[in-house]
Each structure stands twice: as structure tokens, then as C-alpha cells.
Amino acid sequence: MSTSFENKATNRGVITFTISQDKIKPALDKAFNKIKKDLNAPGFRKGHMPRPVFNQKFGEEVLYEDALNIVLPEAYEAAVTELGLDVVAQPKIDVVSMEKGKEWTLSAEVVTKPEVKLGDYKNLVVEVDASKEVSDEDVDAKIERERQNLAELIIKDGEAAQGDTVVIDFVGSVDGVEFDGGKGDNFSLELGSGQFIPGFEDQLVGAKAGDEVEVNVTFPESYQAEDLAGKAAKFMTTIHEVKTKEVPELDDELAKDIDEDVDTLEDLKVKYRKELEAAQETAYDDAVEGAAIELAVANAEIVDLPEEMIHEEVNRSVNEFMGNMQRQGISPEMYFQLTGTTQEDLHNQYSAEADKRVKTNLVIEAIAKAEGFEATDSEIEQEINDLATEYNMPADQVRSLLSADMLKHDIAMKKAVEVITSTASVK
């Protein structure tokens, strides 16, 4: 293989590389065997056409595209490695020449990782809007949340108030015509929860079981159903039940209901204080780490960050998000309909975060390189065991999912983050 690289602009260039016949011939054989079973020729059973007959009838050139797809990935990676390039986006491949019996020549337009000029990243002084302190009010608030979670809904003989739950039937119409999705039966609605269109819940305050209420609202201009956006609607609403929350007394019995490992309310407060202090400590450390990394990135200069890196990160984030949606049974079409957004809106939503994440990774990688951080065998093994514990899977499965290079990269990145944060101080 012969390779060359022509620089076209900052972080951009063209690789030219060749593929030898000793690689091409086996690929042509594979391409032929792939289609052989479907070939017919007079005098031969289906799937038994000899290669010379095929070449004479169709020409060997018809196999070139499939053969190229077989040999290209390995040949391209070998060229990148030989040239010592750090390519960061999908290449644009072009065929320069593909002649029978000769080596093939291809070109690849590539984008390379930008130069990072590091600034200060050690002994940084940062400000954080976080505290390690836990107050009595914090403990009481946590207990109150648990107390509210244990509340029971009981039938209320009287008017509905904010915070009460009403069980309703409703039928919505616009200009006297009912619309899809505007009807519900025995729907439980907590007043003040904001589940329904603004103004809907407020008009049920004061209603009693058995009442029929005409609720008049206007759909927001940004409503996901475009045919309803900005339109006035009427909902004929029947109140079946009014329910109110009955919360348990704040006493030792409540404490035992919340946590079976405590005997008194005071025990629960002590336990919750320890939990909150641990959580606050973690949140504080995370805030310091985030602020220090952000400052280290701000102190660095990234020379001509390629847009392709941002686009790839946005696409990765969007694909991950939509994959999570589909695992919950929500298709892309359904998501965009429910949210009233578009594919472009979703990409724009992730763009700013993608830009920040790409720059952060580049700077941390540059710090790891500047410090000469590498991973030892024992550190790799420890990382595998830690991941196995975190994701509750066998260590061998982790090894099969992650390459040694990926693990080495992650460990070096962690060491770089550690050198930033361990030397940082809070103003």
C-alpha cells in the first residue's frame, strides 16, 4: 500500500491510498460467492456457474463495487494509521482508478482533530453556587415530601379547592365541533397540577360532586396540534367526585412507616441528615469539578474547531434520545406530534450542549497527552470490574463490549480531570 496526505486547509485534507491485488482478489472471490447462488447459465445448475463463465458473460467489473465495500474499511484504517492522522468525522471516499489486474487507487476527504493550545489548568480558583451545609429545614422538607407521598385521597363533601383531585368526564369542542383527543371519562385531575390547558383547572375550583361546569379556554399558540393552536374551546365537564388529601400525623408512627429501620421521628431526622450531607458533599464536589473543567476549557484555545465534530455529536445525542423514546414505545413521529416540535428543533436543542461537550473532551484529551497519562494493566482491570459492578454484568461481558483502547482512553481522561480538580481551590 502507498499512501499520501495533501493538506487542503486547517484540519482538512485528502488521503490518497492504494489497495493491492493480493487484497482485491480475495474480495472479488467473496463478492462472487455472495451472488453465485442466484446465478443461472445454460448447461449449469443454478448456483454453479463457473467464475470464467461469469466473467465472460457479465464482466468482472460488476463485482468491483461489492469487492470495494469488503476491502475499503481495513484499507482506509491502515492508511490513516500509516499517516498518523487523527480523523474525527466520516470521510468522503472517491475512486481514483479501478483497473483490472492493477492496484486500485482511492482518495478520502478527511477532517482531522484540531490543535489545542492549553492555557492554565492547574491550581485554578473557582466560584461555585453550592454548599456542603445541611439545615434543619432541609431535613424537615425531605420528611414532609415523604409525608405527602403517604397521603391518602378521601372523598370530600364540599367544594373543590386547589390541591384537591376531581374525577371528571369532559367533552371538548371548537366552534361546536368535537375534536380528536378532547374527550375523557372518569379522569382524575389534581387541581393546580398543570396537567390541562392553562385556565382549565382554575375553572373547576369551587365545583362539587354532581356539578356540570362549562370550561372555556384558549389553546396556546404553541399547542402541538396545529389545527387547535390559538383557538377558543369549550369543555362540558361533569364532576363525579371531589377528593382531598389526608396526610398522616408527623410522629414516630409516621417515621416507622417511612423507614422500617428507625423507631422514632428523631431517628429518621438523624438518618436523613446523614444522607443529605453525603448528597450535598457529592453535589459540591461535582460543582467544583464542573467549574474547574469549564475554566480550563475557557483558558485553552482550539484552533478552527471543525463543524463536522459538532454535527456528529448532535446526531449521536439525538439518536440516543430517540432510541430511549422508542424503547418507551414512542416513535419519532409520535414524539414530534406530542411536543409540537420538528427534527430541526431537536437538533438545535442539542447543538449548544454538543459544542460544549466536544470542546471539553478535546481539552481534557490534550491535558492527558501533555501530562503523559497512560493506563496500567491493573488500572484497566480495575476499570472493568468497576463497570461490571455499576452495570451489574459479568466482567467478561464488559471486556467484550469495550476495547482496550477505549478503556485506556477513558482512564487517561479521568486522570486529566483529577489533575484539574485536585489542584483547584474555591474562592
UniProtKB/Swiss-Prot annotation:
GO terms under biological process: 'de novo' cotranslational protein folding; cell division; chaperone-mediated protein folding; protein transport; protein unfolding
Cite the EC number: 5.2.1.8
Q: Which reaction does it catalyse?
A: [protein]-peptidylproline (omega=180) = [protein]-peptidylproline (omega=0)
Q: Where in the cell is it found?
A: Cytoplasm
Predominantly, its location class is cytoplasm
KW Repeat (keyword) present: no
Q: What domain of life is recorded for the organism?
A: Bacteria
Every copy of the PPIase FKBP-type domain together lies at: 163-248
Keywords from the named record: Cell cycle, Cell division, Chaperone, Cytoplasm, Isomerase, Rotamase
* Gene Ontology CC terms, in alphabetical order: cytoplasm
Signal peptide residues are none
Q: Give the molecular function GO annotations.
A: peptidyl-prolyl cis-trans isomerase activity; protein folding chaperone; ribosome binding
Q: What does this protein do?
A: Involved in protein export. Acts as a chaperone by maintaining the newly synthesized protein in an open conformation. Functions as a peptidyl-prolyl cis-trans isomerase.
Q: Which family does it belong to?
A: Belongs to the FKBP-type PPIase family. Tig subfamily.
Which PANTHER family does the record match to this protein?
Answer: TRIGGER FACTOR CHAPERONE AND PEPTIDYL-PROLYL CIS/TRANS ISOMERASE, TRIGGER FACTOR-LIKE PROTEIN TIG, CHLOROPLASTIC
Query: Which HAMAP family does the record associate with it?
Result: Trigger_factor_Tig (MF_00303)
Domain free text: Consists of 3 domains; the N-terminus binds the ribosome, the middle domain has PPIase activity, while the C-terminus has intrinsic chaperone activity on its own.
Protein name as catalogued = Trigger factor
Which species does the entry assign this protein to? Streptococcus pyogenes serotype M1
Gene it is expressed from = tig
